[in-house]
């Protein structure tokens, strides 16, 4: 069943917003859905334990019955880079450990599964490992979320180069307009479409309420080989 790794050009550029929109689009097409965000920092304490807002959003778009801990097995309170949060908590944040956790979700064989990373492609894990090493272990095609703002062309092209250089397929990309006041917005989008070696799955404008349904209205899953 189709599964994809979702990464972004930076942190705070709407990876979860786009991932939730993709999951909603798949559910609306009658597909079963599952998701994982294997590591998250900036989690809030609750009666059930630490909970991450982004992971909860993804969980809400899963049609399969998943426990929170399956979606987000490693949750840390400090709103800092995951490897630093893990170090403070005395947790070994290895690609192999994350891979084992994600495999549990992939084994459910949902019609459409997304695995969302944290930050960008080279976010550090344990030692010299990065989140890109997890993506390599999973061997999933990648969806790149481009946060459209000043500097996004360079960030997007470098990210795509790194993804392909790691031997993974770039299945598609999404233009998420995080700064609608970006100078020469249309020209920037045209350059991204010309230079990125993958189909664009959609252009998502800055929305007052970026609900999964509202985001899904701007996305197209067909380039991922999913008929709607």
Swiss-Prot record:
GO cellular component terms, A-Z: cytosol
Compartments (UniProt record): Cytoplasm
Gene: bioD
Protein name listed in UniProt: ATP-dependent dethiobiotin synthetase BioD
SUPFAM superfamilies, A to Z: P-loop containing nucleoside triphosphate hydrolases
Binding-site list for ATP: 12-17, 54, 116-119, 205-207
Protein species of origin: Pseudomonas aeruginosa (strain ATCC 15692 / DSM 22644 / CIP 104116 / JCM 14847 / LMG 12228 / 1C / PRS 101 / PAO1)
Family affiliation: Belongs to the dethiobiotin synthetase family.
Top class in the EC scheme: ligase
The protein's role, per its UniProt record: Catalyzes a mechanistically unusual reaction, the ATP-dependent insertion of CO2 between the N7 and N8 nitrogen atoms of 7,8-diaminopelargonic acid (DAPA, also called 7,8-diammoniononanoate) to form a ureido ring.
Keywords: ATP-binding, Biotin biosynthesis, Cytoplasm, Ligase, Magnesium, Metal-binding, Nucleotide-binding
Cofactors that this protein relies on: Mg(2+)
Classification lineage: Bacteria, Pseudomonadati, Pseudomonadota, Gammaproteobacteria, Pseudomonadales
Reactions catalysed, as given in the entry: (7R,8S)-7,8-diammoniononanoate + CO2 + ATP = (4R,5S)-dethiobiotin + ADP + phosphate + 3 H(+)
Residue sites binding Mg(2+) per the record: 16, 54, 116
Gene Ontology terms, MF aspect: ATP binding; dethiobiotin synthase activity; magnesium ion binding
């Amino acid at each position: 069943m189709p599964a994809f790794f979702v990464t972004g050009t930076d942190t705070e550029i709407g990876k979860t917003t786009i991932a939730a929109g993709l999951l909603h689009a798949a559910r609306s097409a009658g597909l079963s859905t599952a998701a994982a965000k294997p590591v998250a920092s900036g989690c809030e304490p609750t009666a059930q334990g630490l909970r991450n807002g982004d992971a909860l959003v993804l969980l809400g778009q899963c049609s399969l019955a998943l426990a929170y801990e399956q979606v987000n097995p490693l949750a840390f309170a400090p709103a800092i880079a995951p490897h630093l949060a893990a170090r403070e908590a005395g947790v070994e944040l290895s690609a192999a450990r994350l891979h084992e956790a994600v495999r549990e979700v992939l084994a459910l064989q949902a019609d459409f599964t997304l695995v969302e990373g944290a930050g960008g492609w080279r976010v550090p894990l344990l030692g010299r490992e990065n989140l890109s090493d997890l993506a390599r272990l999973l061997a999933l095609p990648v969806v790149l979320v481009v946060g459209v703002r000043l500097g996004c062309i360079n960030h997007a092209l470098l990210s795509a180069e790194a993804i392909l250089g790691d031997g993974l397929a770039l299945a598609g990309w999404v233009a998420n307009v995080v700064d609608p006041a970006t100078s020469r917005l249309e020209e920037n989008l045209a350059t991204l479409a010309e230079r990125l070696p993958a189909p664009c799955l959609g252009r998502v404008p800055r929305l007052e309420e970026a609900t999964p349904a509202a985001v899904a209205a701007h996305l197209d899953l067909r380039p991922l080989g999913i008929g709607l």
